[in-house]
């Protein structure tokens, strides 16, 4: 089967499923222009999947926006530097149960069943190619080069304005923030590094780093997670002379809790847990860290320029004689550049697009008090979400301003587990999100919906009794 044949089969499958259909949502009229029922911010895998899931709910007045050029959405061809995805190849996600929309179907259309059997893990760039195909095959409404700056409530009830970096604001009844891992906060470089070094001497691994320009140079990498080793391998492949990873712990993590969550039924049912159980499990999740994949670690070790320093927290950094000096308990180390793989901080107050609303958004600290000795400020700063990923108000007075906003990004982790920004969870998370958005749209107009039902009188049955006398031939 070719890709063209696969796309034909996909359209046939969608017809069999009665995909789409006539819209039922009542349109809003606004003097300033068109009002979208839903605007999805972010055209990566979560945003595209959300648009498809809404189509399944017959919600069609939807726009997906992304600040990046077409085909550059998400991390896969920007700052992600692993060779392959860490997620097992057989896990389904944004296909929503349509076999001809799966990555496997797309791969086999090009490489056959034997090619699937030969595939170990999904190459990073190949996954991005699949997302490009997915968007085109489903004809999803995406507007690129569109950067959201600020969200604020409109004077008209139930409508939000999305102010953009360029162009007129958009108006929407519902907004889905499908903004990935960093979408609920920001990547963080420790302040003691930013204050000690000029900006050209360091970068967070989530941002652009021209490792090719550092060929022949020495790079120090702070962090013990998978991304630290991804960057070490990538840097060495680009010609860096030395890539040394520094880990605070005395040993690398060996257990990947995600694998257990995938196998034990936790991912689809995490949201049903009581808050106390969610809090305990996520505190453990943050404490464990995700180990590098075995193949990535072995690739790093195979490079002569690689070194790993365990039990080696950075005590300080400084620039001296055109060299960056890093102090650890093991001594001083000299580098030309530092790559910081220390993760991110999740807190809606850090998001510029939510600046007008952040003080009105409920966080875990507002809704749950951990037992003595278990409180975790990292968890407490996460937004406290409803069952459909909706942001909730801190106080009743904040309800109108926050209503209609959905955090379908990594900040949903504490309430929903691996869901919105994890391939392992999208299979379950996307239908839950789409139903919640559709329910809100329906309930917003419930009075009109009920009255329309009560007044419905279109005749369907046209039979007569007694039957009219038939003319004799």
Curated annotation (Swiss-Prot):
Its cofactor is FAD. One of its GO terms (molecular function) is monooxygenase activity. It is an enzyme of class 1 (oxidoreductase). It comes from the Bacteria. Gene3D superfamilies: FAD/NAD(P)-binding domain. Its EC number is 1.14.13.-, 1.14.13.113. FAD cannot be replaced by FMN or riboflavin. InterPro entries: Auxin_biosynth/cation_transpt, FAD/NAD-bd_sf, HpyO/CreE_NAD-binding. Pathway: Purine metabolism; urate degradation. GO terms for biological process: purine nucleobase metabolic process; urate catabolic process. It catalyses: urate + NADH + O2 + H(+) = 5-hydroxyisourate + NAD(+) + H2O; urate + NADPH + O2 + H(+) = 5-hydroxyisourate + NADP(+) + H2O. Keywords: FAD, Flavoprotein, Monooxygenase, NAD, NADP, Oxidoreductase, Purine metabolism. Pfam families: NAD_binding_9 (PF13454). PANTHER family: FAD-DEPENDENT URATE HYDROXYLASE, FLAVIN-BINDING MONOOXYGENASE-LIKE PROTEIN (AFU_ORTHOLOGUE AFUA_4G09220). Catalyzes the hydroxylation of urate to 5-hydroxyisourate (HIU). Is likely to be involved in the urate degradation pathway to allantoin. Is slightly more efficient (about 2.6 times) with NADPH than NADH as the electron donor. Homodimer. This is FAD-dependent urate hydroxylase.
């Amino acid at each position: 089967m070719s890709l063209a044949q696969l796309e034909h089969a996909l359209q046939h499958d969608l017809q069999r499923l009665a995909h789409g259909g006539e819209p039922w949502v009542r349109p809003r009229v606004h003097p300033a222009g068109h009002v979208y029922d839903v605007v999805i911010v972010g055209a990566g895998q979560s945003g595209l999947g959300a648009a498809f899931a809404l189509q399944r709910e017959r919600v069609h007045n939807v726009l997906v926006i992304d600040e990046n050029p077409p085909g550059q959405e998400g991390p896969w061809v920007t700052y992600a530097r692993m060779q392959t995805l860490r997620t097992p190849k057989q896990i389904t996600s944004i296909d929503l149960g349509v076999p001809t929309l799966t990555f496997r179907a797309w791969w086999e259309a090009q490489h056959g069943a034997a090619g699937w059997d030969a595939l170990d893990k999904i190459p990073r760039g190949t996954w991005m190619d699949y997302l490009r195909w997915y968007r085109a095959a489903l004809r999803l409404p995406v507007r690129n080069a569109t950067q959201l700056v600020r969200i604020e409530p409109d004077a008209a009830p139930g409508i939000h304005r999305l102010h953009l970096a360029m162009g007129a604001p958009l108006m929407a009844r519902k907004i889905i923030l499908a903004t990935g891992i960093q979408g609920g906060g920001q990547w963080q470089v420790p302040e003691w590094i930013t204050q000690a070094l000029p900006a050209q001497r360091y970068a967070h691994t989530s941002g652009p780093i021209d490792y090719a320009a550092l060929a022949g140079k020495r790079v120090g990498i702070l962090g013990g997670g998978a991304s630290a080793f991804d960057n070490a391998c990538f840097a060495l492949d680009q010609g860096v002379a030395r890539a040394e990873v520094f880990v605070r712990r005395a040993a690398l993590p060996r257990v990947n809790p995600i694998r257990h969550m995938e196998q034990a039924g936790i991912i689809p049912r995490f949201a049903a847990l009581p808050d106390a159980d969610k809090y305990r499990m996520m505190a453990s999740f943050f404490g464990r860290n995700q180990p590098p994949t075995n193949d990535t670690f072995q690739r790093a070790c195979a490079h002569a320029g690689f070194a790993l320093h365990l039990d080696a927290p950075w005590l300080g950094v400084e620039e001296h004689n055109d060299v960056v000096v890093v102090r650890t308990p093991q001594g001083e180390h000299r580098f030309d550049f530092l790559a910081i793989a220390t993760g991110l901080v999740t807190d809606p107050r850090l998001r510029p697009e939510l600046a007008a609303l952040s003080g009105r958004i409920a966080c875990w600290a507002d809704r749950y008090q951990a037992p003595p000795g278990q409180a975790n400020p990292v968890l407490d700063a996460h937004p406290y979400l409803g069952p459909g990923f909706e942001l909730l108000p801190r106080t009743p007075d904040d309800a109108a301003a926050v209503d209609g906003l959905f955090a379908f990004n990594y900040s949903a982790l504490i309430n929903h587990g691996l869901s919105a920004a994890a391939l392992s969870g999208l299979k379950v998370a996307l239908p839950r999100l789409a139903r919640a958005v559709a329910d809100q749209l329906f309930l917003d107009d419930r009075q009109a919906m009920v009255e329309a039902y009560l007044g419905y009188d279109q005749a369907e049955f046209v039979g007569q009794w007694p039957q009219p006398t038939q003319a004799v031939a």
